[in-house]
Amino acid sequence: MNTRGSGSSSSSSSSQASLMAFSEPPKPASQPSPPSSPMSERPPSGRSRRRAQEPGRFLGVRRRPWGRYAAEIRDPTTKERHWLGTFDTAQEAALAYDRAALSMKGAQARTNFVYTHAAYNYPPFLAPFHAPQYAAAAAAPSSVQYGGGVGAAPHIGSYGHHHHHHHHHGHGAASGASSVGECSTMPVMVPVDPHRSSMSSSLLDMDRNGHDFLFSGADDNSGYLSSVVPESCLRPRGGGAAADHQDMRRYSDADAYGMMGLREDVDDLAQMVAGFWGGGDAADQLGACGFPASGGAADMVASSQGSDSYSPFSFLSH
């Protein structure tokens, strides 16, 4: 009895399993998975791969909290950041960055926009400050007409209009019809006036003559007045011997007039001394000292010539 029960149970279970197998849908054949490469398993590093540029953002442009956009660029050689300015829109800041990048790296620069080959002819970024030879090279082919003519100075484009906006406002009147974003590196040429040039040459000659007049050579440093002041200033031109004789006569008349005034002063001094001592004793004392008691300058000169005693006014007689 037990064998029949066990056989019936096993047959029923097998029949149920077969029914379940027919009821299940057939499984598709599995395809072999491709072998995984070792590069895909490694996570990408931030230094090796550059971060993808987000839409709406530009290289070298940052947005300020108050709504303006700042542009700056980093020098690849010195690793220094150069400030390009703040702008109202992100496109203007991106243009300023592109011009600075083209000035630094040329065709190898990464820019925000696509440019033609003509845009690569910008001067170096720091040319106006560190390389004056670029300005001299630009001035060589320029043609300038002097004497009232007007010369056309070449213009070299800068890397940004807003980077030196105060320079553009300052040179606006001089440049005239210069385009936006360009600045002139040529100096302003002033036409030469022939009359002013002759005046300047005459002033230069006067300056040189004055220098020769004040600072003479080493061989003329004798110490006399003639080595400092020319003889033409000391002696008037023309006249010859007659002029010299007239000058000597003028000097002798002046000396005689001075001696007369000095003798009158001596007479006044004698009278003052006589009044101070008083009486006849004064005359004796004046006679002993060599002063005449009366008679004026003539008696004093006569007494001084006739007496052997010392007189302090004896030099007046010579």
Curated annotation (Swiss-Prot):
One of its GO terms (cellular component) is nucleus. Keywords: Developmental protein, DNA-binding, Nucleus, Transcription, Transcription regulation. GO terms for molecular function: DNA binding; DNA-binding transcription factor activity. GO terms for biological process: floral meristem determinacy; positive regulation of DNA-templated transcription; regulation of secondary shoot formation. The keyword Transferase does not apply. Residues 25-37 have a biased composition (Pro residues). Residues 1-15 have a biased composition (Low complexity). Residues 160-171 have a biased composition (Basic residues). It is found in: Nucleus. PROSITE patterns: AP2_ERF. Residues 57-114 bind DNA. Pfam families: AP2. Disruption phenotype: Altered specification of terminal and lateral spikelet meristems, resulting in the generation of a panicle composed of excessive ramification of rachis-branches. Residues 1-59, 158-178 are annotated as: Disordered. Belongs to the AP2/ERF transcription factor family. ERF subfamily. Required to prevent the formation of axillary meristems within the spikelet meristem and permit the subsequent establishment of floral meristem identity. Mediates the transition from spikelet to floret meristem. Determines the transition from panicle branching to spikelet formation. May specify floral organ identity by regulating the class B genes (Agamous-like genes) MADS6 and MADS17, as well as class E genes MADS1, MADS7 and MADS8 in floral meristem. Possesses transactivation activity. This is Ethylene-responsive transcription factor FZP. It comes from Oryza sativa subsp. japonica (Rice).
